[in-house]
Amino acid sequence: MSCLVSPYLRNQSTDNSPLLTSQILLDCGIGGDSDQEDGAAEEGVARHRVLIFCQLKQMLDIVENDLFRKSMPSVTYMRMDGSTDVSKRHAVVQTFNADPSIDVLLLTTHVGGLGLNLTSADTVIFVEHDWNPMKDLQAMDRAHRLGQKRVVNVYRLIMRGTLEEKIMGCASLSSLPTSRS
């Protein structure tokens, strides 16, 4: 199953997910040279805060190692996945919401499901998707909560010509309401 989700797990030279995610973060004003000038963006300009969702912890490892540690070391991030102790998850969420210097929160879709309030983020990136479209919608809703004052942009990275593209096409059709005559 992992190879269907990300060819990078099978052949490291074929996946552009870290590169694409890097470009989205740069477009959001995160991780570029402007982060290093005076430690932040210009005064009065709101910085974007990002939630990055992956279905598998292995893909979070790829994003963390190849994107943040190697390509974008100036990006500050936190991570929460199934191995995060349940007693520490609330503290991770509270810290991310309260500390505007943290640019990104990496999450697995399942740990970022019901009950979390992450309204400090205004950008959601799905690097890999859950086959159940409702789980992705629940994860997306973490940023679309009461109290959200900014527009939330959602990016879905899907590799063209893959089985994932076909499955996501079917999943989006299955999530549409049916009309009955």
For each predicted feature, which ranges?
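ASCE P-loop NTPase motor core, strongest for the SF2 helicase catalytic module
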Residues: 1-181
